[in-house]
């Protein structure tokens, strides 16, 4: 359920910020083509992240956007087995790059699984509808 809410929020944030900046009140701005440098959230959300040696180091569990609708951080689940014992950490969006490998979209980060495991943990607080630091 949380994932559906996040996807809907991303769509709402992106559309509302674009609307408020580029359109006059009461008029809808429609696109006749897509920006050449655009990507999709689905290329990141719920995707595995690998180190430069192609070892899986985690999975993206959330995509964070600023008030302008720009992606600025990713929450990556690291460690654990089938979600049990997993730790969620935050990384800057710019630290993950995408590449094509074997005709698939791969996300690569120049770090190790151990480095991610040692990073501060975060948990999703549904009452605040945001990620907050885990208490030690």
What function would you assign to each model-found segment?
Residues 11-12:
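Repetitive helical segments and hydrophobic/amphipathic motifs
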């Amino acid at each position: 359920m949380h994932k559906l809410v996040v996807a809907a929020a991303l769509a709402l944030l992106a559309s509302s910020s674009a609307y408020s900046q580029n359109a006059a009140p009461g008029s809808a701005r429609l696109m006749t083509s897509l920006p050449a440098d655009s990507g999709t959230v689905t290329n990141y959300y719920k995707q595995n992240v690998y180190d430069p040696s192609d070892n899986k180091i985690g999975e993206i569990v959330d995509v964070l956007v600023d008030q302008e609708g720009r992606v600025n951080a990713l929450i990556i689940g690291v460690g654990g087995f089938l979600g049990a014992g997993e730790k969620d950490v935050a990384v800057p969006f710019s630290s993950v790059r995408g590449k094509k490998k074997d005709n698939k979209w791969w996300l690569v980060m120049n770090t190790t699984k151990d480095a991610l495991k040692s990073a501060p943990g975060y948990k999703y607080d549904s009452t605040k509808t945001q990620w907050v630091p885990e208490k030690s």
